[in-house]
């Protein structure tokens, strides 16, 4: 049992939350009113009595984290932020969904509204990312305070989330939940709002299984509570709900927890309660008036604030301030006792790289041999291990492809309870830095997003480039949130070979380059790979990056040995040049740079002056000023060729009217990887032919 006793002021605050939610959607003319109305008592109970937070300092290190996975119900959270004193105002509620300047968008957006921990909306991602938050808490605590019992550590906190049937129906929640149980994430509690309604009607049509039994099978602690009484009446008993939550917290310290709350959507709105129409549309003037009458409000008054109830709810800020002061004492004692760890914490919080980062890369590059064949995935693995030696905050793994992606950190313990140990991975402990996601690419993307949002550490996750499609929605969300997640995608072309076209990416470079604020990086060789990592970690903007890497060996180029350090960070740079103005520019990325270099030599032998431009990252190149772009790709040189083992779509902005792509505009082939490249025209000979054709067209147009 909890010490919490519901008062009349609590009841009045919950009623006010319902009315404000209805008014906000009505004024906006669109939105999702039903869930915020029926979730009001749940959210109020969490914010007032369970979530440890300080509205005076939304970014307080010691706070619990709350994620509203069903982001369409955003007013559920906005109203509680208003009640708690986060700086969300009544005017903000009135401006719900109100355009680019609003602080209360239709779905919560990270970095826009104080108290919002992540952007949610695509269902299931908040649920899965909440698991990432729990990963991040545990690893960071192990990094900074491993010896202290977790409840006594200033770095221990809990993760709270609310989800609905839509989240549960999305496959991502199931695959992530399975992994969460395996990890024994006892600081994660998810409230499952089971109102049995979605846009197309009663969920019995599509969700027939016993969800709690499914989660029990995963290894979760489960319980349930119902506002619907046995006699059919409805009672929002928040004392009873609080007791169930408190019981779960005590009973399952080492299990993630799912608490199913049976509710009626939009209760007590006349004509809209338990009706699908209340899910995603405004209620209408008559229904809103009926809701207000049912709750004792004037149906003619909009956005009425019960000042006494609001003042009561705002007392949570006083409790938060007191909790913050207690935490400060604990944190200060930790800092005094652990000066080295405190220095590490300060560096991580500031986002600074460690001493020795550049030297680790320089020393590695000194081992590269010009002319030697090295797959860029192999170079990537060498880089990760080199910088991991000086970056304790770097951790990650793969979706069951670590040996292929080269994402294994040599000698690192596995992040998993000791009982998860296997013959292949005998060293498991809760603070390990080697991650294993199983065959769960989407979960991997969501978890690493959550790690970034919930800690000061730097995760990475790897898979085959072909399977990045499974991860795409999480990648897009990272780009939208502008967080520096690191995706490592190997086996990047038809050179994958005998696995055939199901495993040979063709359209993927174009499709990921189409995502705004995602930096796609495809290095040509070992030197470019090392420099790509250097710049990704050194740059101060906070965008996600995708390292797209070869399966096959590619030669370490003499030209990159001399120029990559200054060139890669520019996104595109002159790798091979000529005397005077070139006759043609050959642009290439990744494994095809070697063919552009070879073609330039052939053309030179025929008296054609060809400049080779390596383009490891179009996004980084687009960040450069006009003067630099003109120096690399002078407008006067209209004969151009692009060379990339994928569709040519992204290259046309550089090719101009007379340029010729050497590309792959079909699915791959079953067969040897090198032969596939030849059969599909990715050769130096084809580059030479394309260069001559482009030059001829330019001449003909004169």
Where are the predicted features?
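General structural signal for secondary-structure boundaries
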Residues: 6, 87-92, 207, 229, ...
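Thiamine diphosphate
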Residues: 1-159, 315-546, 550-555, 632, ...
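Residue(s) in the substrate-gating loop at a strand-loop-helix junction
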Residues: 165
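Walker B beta-strand of ABC/ABC-like P-loop ATPase nucleotide-binding domains
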Residues: 162
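Terminal amphipathic helices with adjacent charged low-complexity linkers/tails
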Residues: 61-62, 263-269, 273-355, 619
